[in-house]
Amino acid sequence: MKILALDIATKTGFATDLTSGVWDLKLKKGESNGMKLIRLNSKVREVVESLNIDLVAMERPAGLFKSAIITESELIGVVKLYCEEKNINYTEYSATEIKKFFTGKGNEKKVDMIEEAKRRFTEIEI
């Protein structure tokens, strides 16, 4: 099964078994807010179609800042709509669920997650 994992934000992290990186969806001067949505749709489409992705996994929106949660929710909606149109399965996980699965504790700090990834995946530069 080919999986595309997304950490959705204005700078969206993505990973598959073959590639990973960050998509910068930041608006340029004079662009409408909808350009973020268009950029993300284009990037997701490109990866899904070129790598024959079967499942898209995303982190659920969370945080303290309402505007960031709204932006993340809009971006996630774009991904869900694309997946529905193309009949691609998708799922969402909270940060706590991801941390608990990966480290056994749902409240690990990001630095601890990185250390665990380095420990597990020695063949990859992290």
Question: What is the meaning of each model-derived region?
Answer:
Residues 1-126:
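Phosphate- and other anionic-substrate recognition elements at nucleic-acid/protein interfaces
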